[in-house]
């Protein structure tokens, strides 16, 4: 379902599930007024130049925490192959190219009419020029047009992304769900990097991103040698060696 304008593709999908009681729906919008990312943050989209998309699943994976990893792998695989770019996955749910953000992923579990549904939101910068981004993110954001030097057909790209996302999400219940983490590591731009992590209590730690555990939590070796497990939070990658 391709719509001209919505408040949020996640909210529109939620309304459709509630009214139609079916989940074989993909919502894409040319314009999204109130897109959101993780922990309620606003997600900035450029009308008619972005992909703002939400998909629903009525079977929860064995490990719901791995959903964003599966979707990240799917998007990276499609974009890397189609556009010959090196897409990196930044923990936990961002798509990066050349140290700039190309897109992000949001997974939410909602209880609707006595049933649990997984809602997956994808935001992707497609046909923006640098000056289309707000000034405060211009240095940190990129788009497929900037990277490839040509405009991209958004509808054709959605047709490539949706089946690949379905494939990887559904695979979480068909094979060992932890295989997706091995795939994620192949695209990771996080592991081995010097990072600063903001913890849920608003404190910070600094160190090296070592690995993921079986639930997708990030293992960090702090400067004092201690290993810390980060299950939720934000990280900043510092592109320089540790002392």
Write out the residue ranges for each language-model feature.
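Long, positively charged amphipathic alpha-helical accessory segments at protein N-termini or as interdomain linkers
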Residues: 61-62, 69-87, 97-243
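Conserved active-site carboxylates
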Residues: 94
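N-terminal lobe of the biotin/lipoate ligase/transferase fold
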Residues: 1-81, 85, 103, 227-228, ...
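A generic fold-level signal
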Residues: 21-22, 48, 90, 114, ...
């Amino acid at each position: 379902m391709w719509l001209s304008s919505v408040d949020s593709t996640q909210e529109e999908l939620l309304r459709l599930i509630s009214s139609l009681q079916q989940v074989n729906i993909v919502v894409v919008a040319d314009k999204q007024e109130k897109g959101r990312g993780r922990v309620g943050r606003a997600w900035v989209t450029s009308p008619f130049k972005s992909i703002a998309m939400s998909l629903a699943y009525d079977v929860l994976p064995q490990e719901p925490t791995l959903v964003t990893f599966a979707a990240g792998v799917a998007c990276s695989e499609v974009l890397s192959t189609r556009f010959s770019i090196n897409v990196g996955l930044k923990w936990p749910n961002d798509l990066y190219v050349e140290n700039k953000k190309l897109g992000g992923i949001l997974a939410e579990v909602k209880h609707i009419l006595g049933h649990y549904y997984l809602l997956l939101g994808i935001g992707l910068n497609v046909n923006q020029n640098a000056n289309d981004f707000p000034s405060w993110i211009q240095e940190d954001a990129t788009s497929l047009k900037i990277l490839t030097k040509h405009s991209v057909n958004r509808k054709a790209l959605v047709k490539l992304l949706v089946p690949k996302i379905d494939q990887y999400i559904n695979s979480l219940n068909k094979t060992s769900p932890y295989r997706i983490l091995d795939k994620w590591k192949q695209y990771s731009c996080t592991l081995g990097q010097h990072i600063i992590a903001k913890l849920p209590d608003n404190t910070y730690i600094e160190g090296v991103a070592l690995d993921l555990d079986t639930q997708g939590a990030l293992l960090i070796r702090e400067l004092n040698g201690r290993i810390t497990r980060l299950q939720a939070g934000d990280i900043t990658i510092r592109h320089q060696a540790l002392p």
